[in-house]
């Protein structure tokens, strides 16, 4: 009986907390811009993730309409080695250069850089998968910053 009461009370509190998904259709309407054209150069994996996140803004044309040219690079840097010369710590650094055009005229240009440090793994397959996941997460962070910057361009 106590479990049912606890579950019921928990359900009431959680349902009224006001949670909304960040990229819901309702929240994308808060940003009064659209993207008419996207072009990408550079790291394919990062570009695909950015394109996936920006697709919400290409659906309908609004008053403020941007054309984006995105150039991305990603590099893996060795931070530390052990006595045998094997790498023990790495850092993935992702840099995205964005040219924002409005009506065929350069409106803004900015660079967003993110990095993440991690330790080596003896299982190379798991290490590769972990690196891919890190790159995807960095691309998500960069995309969130990009959307915020686009919303603030006057």
Model-derived regions, located:
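C-terminal partner/receptor-binding element of secreted or periplasmic proteins
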Residues: 130-152
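Surface-exposed short loop/turn segments
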Residues: 51, 61-62, 66-109, 115-132, ...
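Sec-dependent bacterial lipoprotein signal peptides
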Residues: 1-17
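Mobile beta-alpha loop/short-helix "lid" or hinge segments that flank ligand
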Residues: 20-27, 112-120
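Post-signal-peptide N-terminal segment of Sec-exported extracytoplasmic proteins
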Residues: 39-67
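Second-shell loop/turn segments in exported
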Residues: 37-40, 125-137
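Bacterial Sec signal peptide processing site at the extreme N-terminus
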Residues: 14-34
């Amino acid at each position: 009986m106590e479990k049912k009461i606890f579950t019921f009370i928990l359900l009431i509190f959680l349902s009224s907390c006001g949670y909304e998904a960040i990229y819901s259709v309702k929240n994308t309407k808060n940003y009064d811009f659209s993207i008419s054209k996207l072009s990408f150069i550079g790291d394919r994996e990062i570009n695909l993730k950015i394109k996936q996140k920006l697709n919400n803004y290409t659906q309908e044309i609004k008053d403020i309409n941007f054309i984006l040219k995105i150039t991305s690079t990603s590099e893996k840097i060795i931070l530390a080695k052990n006595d045998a010369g094997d790498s023990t710590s790495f850092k993935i650094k992702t840099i995205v250069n964005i040219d924002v055009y409005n009506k065929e005229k350069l409106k803004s240009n900015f660079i967003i850089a993110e990095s993440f440090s991690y330790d080596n793994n003896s299982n190379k397959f798991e290490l590769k998968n972990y690196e891919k996941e890190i790159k995807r997460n960095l691309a998500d962070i960069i995309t969130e910053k990009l959307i915020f910057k686009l919303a603030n361009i006057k």
